């Protein structure tokens, strides 16, 4: 676990990281996302503005589940991604299309200013227990809203187990 004294948690860095995440996702067509607060779905939203407002309003926000289609990759079907709230010192995961590698790495670096040295690999292992095909763009999962909620619940259980080890 990273040293809490090394955390960069001031308002400017958190806002910069939120902006970086939203700028990254603006490359894609967002279909919906589900925000989860303390393991309870807050609702389904359809705009970047709602996403940003939700992140600001809920300091205890755990995870946000995005479902969108990437127009830059014709092979890519609807994909579900998980990213954490910036207020939690937890691992994080952001996947991306092959031709968006530079932008994705930039976002990962920005988020790591907040999350520091948490293991991205550990996060990927835990995500794969919920979304076994998330890295395979030809068989990416297509989830309904209910299925997304269920996947989040399963993910939170798996993430809790990993973090308690």
UniProtKB/Swiss-Prot annotation:
Source organism (scientific name): African swine fever virus (isolate Pig/Kenya/KEN-50/1950) (ASFV)
Record localization: Host membrane
Membership in a protein family: Belongs to the asfivirus F165R family.
Membrane-topology descriptor: Single-pass membrane protein
Entry annotated with the keyword DNA repair: no
Induction pattern: Expressed in the late phase of the viral replicative cycle.
Organism lineage: Viruses, Varidnaviria, Bamfordvirae, Nucleocytoviricota, Pokkesviricetes
Protein's UniProt keywords contain Metal-binding: no
Predominant place of localization: host cell
Ranges annotated as spanning the membrane: 16-36
Name by which UniProt lists this protein: Uncharacterized protein F165R
Keywords attached to this entry: Host membrane, Late protein, Membrane, Transmembrane, Transmembrane helix
A cellular component term, taken from the record's GO annotations: host cell membrane
């Amino acid at each position: 676990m990273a040293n809490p004294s090394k955390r960069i948690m001031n308002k400017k860095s958190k806002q910069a990281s939120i902006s970086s995440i939203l700028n990254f996702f603006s490359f894609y067509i967002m279909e919906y996302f589900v925000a989860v607060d303390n393991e309870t779905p807050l609702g389904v939203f359809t705009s970047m503005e709602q996403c940003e407002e939700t992140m600001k309003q809920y300091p205890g926000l755990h995870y946000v589940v995005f479902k969108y289609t990437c127009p830059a990759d014709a092979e890519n079907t609807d994909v579900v991604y998980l990213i954490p709230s910036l207020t939690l010192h937890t691992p994080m995961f952001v996947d991306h299309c092959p031709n968006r590698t530079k932008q994705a790495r930039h976002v990962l670096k920005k988020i790591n200013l907040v999350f520091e040295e948490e293991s991205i690999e550990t996060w990927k292992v835990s995500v794969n227990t919920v979304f076994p095909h998330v890295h395979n763009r030809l068989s990416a999962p297509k989830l309904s809203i209910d299925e997304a909620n269920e996947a989040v619940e399963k993910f939170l259980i798996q993430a809790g187990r990993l973090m308690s080890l």
